[in-house]
Each structure stands twice: as C-alpha cells, then as structure tokens.
C-alpha cells in the first residue's frame, strides 16, 4: 500500500471556514490525503481564506510568499487557495503568485479532487463558479469529528447587501440546506460522539425548508437523543422571527447565548450601511429576546469609522452598547472592500478611527469583565473539550460560551458536568465540579 499523502490546511476567518476546511479535508481524503499540522511535511497546502477586511486578504498573500522556499525545496508540492479571497480574486492570485496550483471558491470545493487531478499535468486551475448543483450533494459523508462540539452549516450566502460587506459577492445568494439532510448529518455527528452542535450560516436565521424556520429546525434537532446543546451563528436582526425568539424560552437545549451583530447605534449610519433596521428596532428586539430567556448572554459586531460617521453617530453607538450590556463584542475599524457601495465614499482619518475604536473597546471590555464577574458563585453546565495545561485540569465551554478551567482529575473530553464558578480572569473562568 502506498504511503498516504499529507494535507495541511490553514483556516482564516469565520466558523463557516472551519466547517468548510473539515469538508475539504474529507473530500481530499478520497484522494488518499490525511491531515498534518506541519506545513513542511505536506504534499498539499491549502489556505482557506477570509475577505472581510483588507488585512485578512493581504495576509494570505504574505503567507503565500512564505511558502516559496517550501515550494522550491519540494517542486511537487501542490498549493491551493480556497475561500472568499479565492472567490474575489480568482485568476489574479495565479498572476501574483506563480507558486499557486489551484484556486477554488467556497461554492466549488466539492470539485477539489477533480481540480487536483488536472494539476498533475502541470495545469493551473481556477474554479470560482456558482454551480447549479448543491456542493453538499457531492461531498462524502462526514466521518471524523474533532471533539464533542461540532459545526453544521445550514445556510450560506446573504441577500442583505450591507454597503460594507463582500459576502453577497463571495458567497452568493442565500441558500438553505434541506431539512432532511441536516437532520441526517446531525444524527451522524451525534453517533460519532458529538454532544453540542452550532448551526452556521452567513445569515443563519434566514434558514427555511419545508415550511420551517430556524426555530422549527432547532426544535426538531433537540429531539435527537444524545444531542445536549444547540447554538447558532451569525444572525441578522431582521430575521429574528417569533418562533426563533420563542425557542430561546421553550427549548432547554438551546444555550443562553446569542451573537446578534448591530454594527452601529446611529440610525443615520445604519441607513448608510443599508442595514434595513434602526437602533430602536434592535433595542426592542433585545427586550423580546431577554423576556424569553432572561439569562441570555448577548454579543455583537461593531464597525467604527464608517464613511460619514460623526462624533454624534459614534456616541449613539456607545449609548446603544450601554443600553444593551454585551458579554463581549467584535469591533473593527471600517475597511473598504473593492466592489462594495461604501468603497466609493471618502474614508475618515485613520487617527479618528483609531481613537474611536479604542474608546468602544474599552467600554465593551468593561462590560465583558462585569459579565464574567457576575458568573462567580453561579452553577453552570460545562462541556469538556480538552485537557488543561495543568495536571488534572479540564477545559470546556459553559452554557454562555465562556471558557472554563476546572480541576477534575477524573474528567474526560466529552463529559457534560455541573460546575460552580469560583473565579474570573480576563478571558476565562475557573470553577469546581459539583457532585464529583
């Protein structure tokens, strides 16, 4: 039997890219590839990329440059670029980087084995089509899982066309995977030891199939024996349907955590962003969600320095943050993306954006620390995902998605235990196992 070929995948960006990387590895497994964590050992290197911000795209080119010595030393090494930079740049990647053998967009990665065959004769291949066939119909059944928590893509693409965002151009229109196939994939994950599933989509709460919305899907998934926890990300405020909000109160397996991006607290900027909602709409939505699940922890996304943002607009964003009280948030300076409507507008001075980002992050950090301190003394569920750095220590995620370190010599990966939180650190909690 010939020795297995080795595949190294570097994943950038969102959770969906993590899921996509797993599926690409499975597709290439049919060609005899096994994963390695060392690029120098690999027969193929695949960069699964993100295009949300300019720095993310440029980092890909920097990483490709660092692969030149490896390609020189191993001329037969195959190098591929996948994901949203691949979709956005296509042939340009081959022009800028002669060492790249193939470029594949996020809707075409089921074709990777065939593309790889075409490179064997020296061809350089690009596939960034939006094929009519569903890529999920052409991928092998998921066989491997990495621990007790897994991602499950239920929806792809976005029809919202926010003025700053490339997702509609790189991922395409909103597409929902069929209900029956999702149920089958979820059951398969549980059979392989998964106890927590996070449902993924660029606009996950836009999912619909067979007359069901995301709330209905969650209710059906919750009936699977052995599946203990459910989460979903990322959502748009306009698609928080009544049945989904109700599921937060009615379904115990749906964890008390929600990431709901708002981007700005200024109605003027929200309109310029084409977000199609107001700050007041968002605040009323938060009230309804908290009425359904009072202990829910909320997180969000913010962009500072969007073209035209005034000091008053920025203060409105700070006011919204104070009004909601977030457990954490991702915040960024505006980054113009080519081809988006906002890219045509004049940008704010860099020093203004830097100062605003610092102020916003200071407020969010203050709220995050308060939220974590409020957990001290409380009992929570923790799903162990790995052993800790210290002997006899386990690390897992709480119901609210906090990382929790627990001294538990008898603990095993996959255990779902009750823990009393005893201490809070900047990015994690510590606790003691109950009933051990």
Curated annotation (Swiss-Prot):
Name the record gives this protein: tRNA-2-methylthio-N(6)-dimethylallyladenosine synthase
SMART domains recorded: Elp3 (SM00729)
Domain MTTase N-terminal residues, every copy: 5-121
NCBIfam families recorded: miaB-methiolase, MiaB/RimO family radical SAM methylthiotransferase
Self-association state and partner proteins as the record states: Monomer.
Enzyme Commission identifier(s): 2.8.4.3
Record field: catalytic activity: N(6)-dimethylallyladenosine(37) in tRNA + (sulfur carrier)-SH + AH2 + 2 S-adenosyl-L-methionine = 2-methylsulfanyl-N(6)-dimethylallyladenosine(37) in tRNA + (sulfur carrier)-H + 5'-deoxyadenosine + L-methionine + A + S-adenosyl-L-homocysteine + 2 H(+)
Gene3D superfamilies the UniProt entry points to: Methylthiotransferase, N-terminal domain, tm_1862 like domain
Residues that bind [4Fe-4S] cluster 2: 158, 162, 165
Residues that, per the record, bind [4Fe-4S] cluster 1: 14, 50, 84
């Amino acid at each position: 039997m010939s020795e297995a070929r080795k595949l190294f995948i570097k994943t950038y960006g969102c959770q969906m890219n993590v899921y996509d990387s797993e599926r690409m590895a499975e597709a290439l497994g049919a060609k005899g590839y096994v994963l390695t964590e060392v690029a120098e050992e690999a027969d193929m290197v695949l960069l699964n990329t993100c295009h949300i911000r300019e720095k993310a795209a440029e980092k890909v080119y920097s990483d490709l440059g660092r692969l030149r010595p490896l390609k020189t030393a191993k001329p037969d090494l195959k190098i591929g670029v996948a994901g949203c930079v691949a979709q956005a740049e296509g042939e340009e990647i081959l022009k800028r980087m002669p060492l790249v053998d193939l470029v594949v967009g996020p809707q075409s990665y089921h074709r990777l084995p065939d593309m790889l065959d075409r490179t064997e004769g020296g061809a350089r291949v690009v596939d960034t089509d939006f094929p009519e066939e569903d890529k999920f119909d052409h991928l092998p059944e998921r066989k491997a899982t990495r621990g007790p928590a897994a991602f499950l893509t239920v929806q792809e693409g976005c029809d919202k066309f926010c003025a700053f965002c490339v997702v509609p151009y790189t991922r395409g229109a909103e597409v929902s995977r069929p209900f029956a196939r999702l149920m089958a994939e979820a059951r398969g994950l549980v059979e392989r030891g998964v106890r927590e599933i996070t449902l993924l989509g660029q606009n996950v709460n836009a999912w619909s199939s067979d007359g069901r919305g995301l709330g209905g899907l969650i209710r059906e998934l919750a009936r699977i024996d052995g599946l203990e926890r459910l989460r979903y990300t990322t959502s748009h405020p306009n698609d928080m349907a009544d049945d989904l909000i109700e599921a937060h109160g009615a379904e115990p397996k749906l964890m008390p955590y929600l990431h709901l991006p708002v981007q700005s607290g200024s109605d003027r900027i929200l309109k310029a962003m084409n977000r199609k909602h107001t700050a007041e709409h968002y605040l009323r939505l938060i009230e309804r969600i908290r009425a359904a699940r009072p202990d829910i922890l909320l997180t969000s996304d913010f962009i500072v320095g969007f073209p035209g943002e005034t000091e008053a607009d920025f203060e409105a964003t700070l006011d919204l943050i104070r009004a909601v009280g977030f457990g954490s948030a991702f915040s960024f300076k505006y980054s113009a993306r080519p081809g988006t409507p906002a890219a045509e507008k004049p940008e704010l001075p860099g020093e203004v954006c830097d100062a605003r980002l610092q102020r916003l992050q200071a407020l969010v950090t203050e709220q995050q620390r308060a939220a974590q301190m409020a957990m001290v003394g409380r009992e929570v569920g923790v799903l162990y995902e790995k052993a800790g750095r210290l002997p006899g220590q386990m690390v897992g995620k709480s119901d609210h998605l906090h990382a929790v370190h627990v001294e538990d010599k008898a603990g095993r990966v996959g255990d779902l235990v009750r823990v009393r939180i005893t201490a809070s650190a900047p990015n994690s909690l510590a606790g003691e196992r109950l009933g051990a």
